[in-house]
Amino acid sequence: DVVDAQARRMGRLVTDLRKLADLETAALSLEDVDIAETVHDAAQAVGEEGAARGGGPRIRLDLPQVPWPLSHVRGDGDLLYSAVYNVISNASKYTSPGGTVEVRGREESGTVTIEVADTGIGVPQADLPAVWSELARAGNARGLPGSGLGLALVSTIVRRHGGSVRMASREGVGTRVWLSLPVAGPADTP
């Protein structure tokens, strides 16, 4: 029934708004996080969800192993997983089956950067400045599931960890999202 569906949607929206408000001020549970493992686990979960729905885009991982893997980061492992999962899930949601989502990792100058690139619908240029804002939805995403809070949550999580987020997109071509986090220094590791 339509009323029940709308009530459930509003309940999820309120829950997400509470999460966002809590994230702004809550203390983080800091630990040494293997960000490559986090990315792998999130990509695998999104891939399995796509397969369960009858197919999704190909998800390819390019995480360095030699001469050394990505450094660990210091942070809340559950929150970092949520941020990475959300970006990969968005890329999958807005990319047709048969399309591609590539997840790449690199490390440079004390920063680990995770890039998620897709061949999805892209974000209109006019909508790019607001994508990290609460309740923001690109004009071409209307009618697709989502509350418009996911990227606001991602941005808040990454900023709370001392990092930054960035997006580039071309409508009808695809989107690239970068999550950059400081590596865990020797004083940060247990």
Predicted features, each with a name:
Residues 118:
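Acidic ATP/Mg2+-coordinating residue in the GHKL
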Residues 91-92:
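Short helix-loop "hinge" at the ATP-lid/N-box region of the Bergerat-fold HATPase_c
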Residues 98-110:
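Short beta-strand/loop element within the Bergerat-fold HATPase_c
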Residues 2-10:
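Short alpha-helical segment of the dimerization/phosphotransfer core of two-component systems
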Residues 24-29, 68-75:
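Conserved micro-motifs of the catalytic ATP-binding
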Residues 123-135:
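Short conserved segment of the HATPase_c
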